[in-house]
Amino acid sequence: MRPIDDSSLTWDDGALVTVDQRGLPHEARPLRLRTADQIIDAIKTLAIRGAPAIGIAGAFAVVLATRAHTRDGIVDVAAVRAEADRIAAARPTAVNLAWAVDRVRPRIAEGADAVLAETLDMLAEDGRVNRAAATHAADLVQRLCGPRPLRVLTHCNTGRLATSAFGTAIGALRVLAERGAVEEVLVDETRPLLQGARLTTWELAEAGIPHRLTIDSAAAWAMATGLVDCVLVGADRVTARGDVANKIGTYAVALAAHRHGIPFVVVAPESTRDPATASWRDIVVEERAAEEVTAFAGSATAPVGTAAFNPAFDVTPADLVTAVVTEHGVVHGTVAAEPGARIAATARELYARGWMPGTAGNLSVRTGDTAVVTASGLAKGELSATDMVRVAIADSTPLPGQDRRPSAETTIHTAVYRATGAAAVVHVHSPFATALATRAGAADEVRVLRITDYELIKGLGGSDPTAIDLAIFPNWRDVPRIAADIERRLAEHPGAPPVLCIAGHGITTWGENLTQARDRAECLEAVCELVLRTGREHAFAPQTHVLEMGPT
């Protein structure tokens, strides 16, 4: 039996080497896959399965496709891209497959070695990411359930077979077991393909974690009779609002956990989160062959010709999920994420849009008479929940005993908090709003631009849904001076909209929570883009005089 820390996917002499999961637990058949078609077939037939694992396997398939379409050192880029599309479509529900293929696409023109280097980096990252997510999840479970040996129910398979190393939900079980905090794991068999019975029990036995197997339909009764303290599962896709697509049967487990007040915790890498998918209704749920239901171990269990409903996945609504935990900590769930986790997740989203390039920009959340704000000098695309500073709203000073330091722009946040009832502030450098502010602003005075008759104005939080007076502040080198200007104007104009611009600098928005503040930043950027794209020029006046700008 292989050591559990071994990777389930390796690259050897031009081939992807793995174990055929269809043979487990009785036979660990090695697979040596040398073509993209072989990998696609392995993914479709579940020889390779698990969202992170099929993502990495898909990237290796692009490596092999690039090799196959290279002649005399020249890559047929169009042919490889077409192959990449086919690879990404092999299983539609798990977002990791398309994510991994998209990650290596930009390297195709550089040749197979470049695609391979990116894929090997991804493979190395997977173990680190899984271990981090598993540790965060174990910490959360112990916080929710207490420091005692726990009885945990899990569904499907989420170990190194489903990833490449360590595992997600099984990884969390391993961390808990290392802490002496596992009494027993109850494993759903996971019909119809028995990933729990065949794979999870095999991995738990390998790790020496005590467990029992149960039929899927007994999970709710196990909860009702007090045999379960917590549920830990993985995910194939997490929507923008926190809905979770996972192996069929997960939704039923979540419903039972909700009914009995048992924490339902999802453990998955960030690559499983899909901000482009708004809700569960947008997820394509794969349906598989009827024979998986109408037969068992090769023998028919239903009359010939019996029709079957055989979805491979279901989607658990966000309100049934206690927490979605990634390598960055809690990012979704009914359990309130710590401010740092929420801020870090939002910062990564805004970084991906190009609004917080490098170390620029900052976000904050009010916590009583203090605020939690992103620390200075850190790349916003890599923030974690601990990359924050708590400051006093009264004077912007950091509370003692912290390693991180706040940036000078923290004074803008605290100025907004002192002058308004805001609970969160977003300060970013979105391009269209910054460009408009640069054109409209002045070096030494606040200017106001009236924008009218754009539908998105209603998303800016002003009192008039058809018009907004957008204040544009001068960009003083001394940032506290900008903050003083902002606080003074907000005090003088208590009905001012919760958005503003700083010439040549960026935008600041605020709201009742971080989501609302972020949404207002999105709407402001969109409105400013519309204004600029109309191509109309105006002279801009100081704050005592307002000029109008609206659609012609």
Swiss-Prot record:
Bifunctional protein that catalyzes the interconversion of methylthioribose-1-phosphate (MTR-1-P) into methylthioribulose-1-phosphate (MTRu-1-P), and the dehydration of methylthioribulose-1-phosphate (MTRu-1-P) into 2,3-diketo-5-methylthiopentyl-1-phosphate (DK-MTP-1-P). GO terms for molecular function: methylthioribulose 1-phosphate dehydratase activity; S-methyl-5-thioribose-1-phosphate isomerase activity; zinc ion binding. The gene is mtnAB. NCBIfam families: eIF-2B_rel, PRK05720.1, salvage_mtnA, salvage_mtnB. It comes from Nocardia farcinica (strain IFM 10152). One of its GO terms (biological process) is L-methionine salvage from methylthioadenosine. Residues 1-333 are annotated as: Methylthioribose-1-phosphate isomerase activity. The keyword Amino-acid biosynthesis applies. Zn(2+) binds at H427, H429. It catalyses: 5-(methylsulfanyl)-alpha-D-ribose 1-phosphate = 5-(methylsulfanyl)-D-ribulose 1-phosphate; 5-(methylsulfanyl)-D-ribulose 1-phosphate = 5-methylsulfanyl-2,3-dioxopentyl phosphate + H2O. Coiled coil: none annotated. Pathway: Amino-acid biosynthesis; L-methionine biosynthesis via salvage pathway; L-methionine from S-methyl-5-thio-alpha-D-ribose 1-phosphate: step 1/6; Amino-acid biosynthesis; L-methionine biosynthesis via salvage pathway; L-methionine from S-methyl-5-thio-alpha-D-ribose 1-phosphate: step 2/6. Its cofactor is Zn(2+). The active site is at D236. One of its GO terms (cellular component) is cytoplasm. Its EC number is 5.3.1.23, 4.2.1.109. Substrate binds at R49, G50, A51, R91, Q195, N246, K247. This is Probable bifunctional methylthioribose-1-phosphate isomerase/methylthioribulose-1-phosphate dehydratase. Pfam families: Aldolase_II, IF-2B. Keywords: Amino-acid biosynthesis, Isomerase, Lyase, Metal-binding, Methionine biosynthesis, Multifunctional enzyme, Zinc. Residues 334-535 are annotated as: Methylthioribulose-1-phosphate dehydratase activity. PANTHER family: METHYLTHIORIBOSE-1-PHOSPHATE ISOMERASE. The record marks C156 as: Transition state stabilizer. In the N-terminal section; belongs to the eIF-2B alpha/beta/delta subunits family. MtnA subfamily. In the C-terminal section; belongs to the aldolase class II family. MtnB subfamily. Binds 1 zinc ion per subunit. It comes from the Bacteria.
